[in-house]
Amino acid sequence: MSGGSTGERPFSDIITSIRYWVIHSITIPSLFVAGWLFVSTGLAYDVFGTPRPNEYFTQDRQQVPLVNDRFSAKQELEDLTKGI
């Protein structure tokens, strides 16, 4: 004999109901639009602190900011970010 029922609705009943699709026909496109706006307005750059595409290289620093020695990484990072 298998385990007892948890009392929850079967997933097949949920995804075949009209109520499910009425709710999700609004929420799924809304999440897509919200994500698109989050990225296209540049808010994602501000929230996560990543540089915008035109900010990777400044006029003062044109080299690629690479850390070469892992034992002196802190000092190298301080030198790289000194002009920022």
UniProtKB/Swiss-Prot annotation:
Residue spans crossing the bilayer: 22-36
Biological process (GO), any one: photosynthetic electron transport chain
Positions that bind heme: H24
Record GO terms (molecular function): electron transfer activity; heme binding; iron ion binding
Compartments (UniProt record): Plastid, Chloroplast thylakoid membrane
Gene Ontology CC: chloroplast thylakoid membrane; photosystem II reaction center
Location (main, coarse): plastid
Superkingdom as given in the UniProt entry: Eukaryota
InterPro entries assigned: PSII_cyt_b559_asu, PSII_cyt_b559_asu_sf, PSII_cyt_b559_CS, PSII_cyt_b559_N, PSII_cytb559_asu_lum
Reported cofactor(s): heme b
SUPFAM superfamilies: Cytochrome b559 subunits
UniProt cofactor note: With its partner (PsbF) binds heme. PSII binds additional chlorophylls, carotenoids and specific lipids.
Annotated keywords: Chloroplast, Electron transport, Heme, Iron, Membrane, Metal-binding, Photosynthesis, Photosystem II, Plastid, Thylakoid, Transmembrane, Transmembrane helix, Transport
Topology class, membrane: Single-pass membrane protein
Pfam family, one: Cytochrom_B559
Similarity remark: Belongs to the PsbE/PsbF family.
HAMAP family xref list: PSII_PsbE
Subunit structure: Heterodimer of an alpha subunit and a beta subunit. PSII is composed of 1 copy each of membrane proteins PsbA, PsbB, PsbC, PsbD, PsbE, PsbF, PsbH, PsbI, PsbJ, PsbK, PsbL, PsbM, PsbT, PsbX, PsbY, PsbZ, Psb30/Ycf12, at least 3 peripheral proteins of the oxygen-evolving complex and a large number of cofactors. It forms dimeric complexes.
Role according to the record: This b-type cytochrome is tightly associated with the reaction center of photosystem II (PSII). PSII is a light-driven water:plastoquinone oxidoreductase that uses light energy to abstract electrons from H(2)O, generating O(2) and a proton gradient subsequently used for ATP formation. It consists of a core antenna complex that captures photons, and an electron transfer chain that converts photonic excitation into a charge separation.
UniProt name for this protein: Cytochrome b559 subunit alpha
Gene that produces this protein: psbE
